[in-house]
Structures are given as C-alpha cells and as structure tokens.
From Swiss-Prot:
Highest taxon above the source species: Eukaryota
Region feature Disordered, mapped onto this chain: 145-175
Organism whose genome encodes this protein: Arabidopsis thaliana
Protein name: Polyadenylate-binding protein-interacting protein 6
Sequence motif: PAM2-like, positions: 7-17
Length: 175
C-alpha cells in the first residue's frame, strides 16, 4: 500500500493505527483503586434510566435525600407521564388500525393534546376512506383507467372536431 494521498480523497489524512496514536490505551497508567473511588463519588447517576452505566433504577435506599420542591416536581412528572400513557392507551383502543408508533407521533405532534390528536386522527381517517374510493384493486405501473369521465370525452371530441374541420395549425411568427 502506498503512503501518501489517496486518489479517492487527496485531502484525507493518513490512517494511524490506534496503538500508535497519541494518548492510546497502551501509554496510559494503570488506574488505582483510590482513583476509581474518587471518580465514582463524583458521578451522580440519573436514576430510572440507567445513564452512565449505572444500570436501572436503584430504589430509594441508594437515592440521596431530596428537597420538598424536587419531590413535588418529580411527582408532577410522574403524573404527566401517567396521563400521557393513559391518553396513548385510549387512542390505541379507539383506533385499532393504527400502530402505536403512528399514534405516538400524532400525539407528540399535537403537543400531547388529546382533543387535537383525536381531531387529526378523525381527519386522517376520513381522507383515507375517500382516497380508497379512487384506488384500483391492484396497483401496477401499466394500469390504464378503464372508465373515461364525460369531461375528458368532451375534450377529446372537441379537439378531434377542430382538426377534422379542415383548420390546420399554421405557423405563427412573432416578429
């Protein structure tokens, strides 16, 4: 393999293996137990979501004491989550033909407003049934409509009458 610029991207830097890069794992000092304990105490995990590799919720035994305002805020968040879950379940029961992902998207697009979500889903339901009336049984690239509407027949008849009347399209110059 040639060293130098690549023909694909002449501005790309040459590849340097991980072991030869500055600050690689080989060059670092082994971590002591005391250093690990200091880092562990500095990180405060976000309970309930397993952030920072701490696993899942650790319960109230490990959580630090919280101020009353934090407890009220957390209680409000839990109530909002519960309300959102109940709204989603209601929508899933009301619109069984839609996926949970679709309902979630519509609900979040309406800023978690249940009434607006129901209105939007009703509109989508109406439009989808109207569209189904015009769809053929099978969709194929070669499909040609079998029924020609009256207005298109009249247009075709009118254009054929003008060409058969002996009037020819004359070249008109715009000079």
């Amino acid at each position: 393999m040639k060293s130098g610029s690549s023909t694909l991207n002449p501005y790309a830097a040459a590849y340097v293996p991980l072991s030869k890069r500055e600050g690689s794992l080989v060059d670092t000092k082994p971590v002591t137990q005391q250093h690990m304990q200091q880092q562990h105490h500095q990180q405060q995990p976000y309970y309930g979501y397993g952030v920072q590799g701490m696993g899942s919720y650790q319960g109230t035994q490990m959580s630090p004491k919280k101020s009353p305002s934090e407890m009220v805020y957390n209680h409000q968040l839990k109530d909002e989550d519960l309300e959102m879950d109940m709204d989603i379940e209601y929508l899933l029961a009301t619109y069984p033909g839609l996926s949970q992902e679709s309902i979630n998207d519509v609900y979040l697009a309406n800023t978690c407003d249940l009434d607006a979500t129901i209105e939007m889903l009703n509109q989508l339901e109406i439009y989808s049934t109207e569209a189904e009336e015009y769809l053929p049984d099978t969709l194929d690239i070669g499909d040609v409509p079998e029924i020609i509407t009256e207005s298109s027949k009249q247009k075709n008849d009118g254009s054929s009458a003008s060409s058969s009347s002996g009037i020819r399209n004359a070249n008109v110059s715009s000079s």
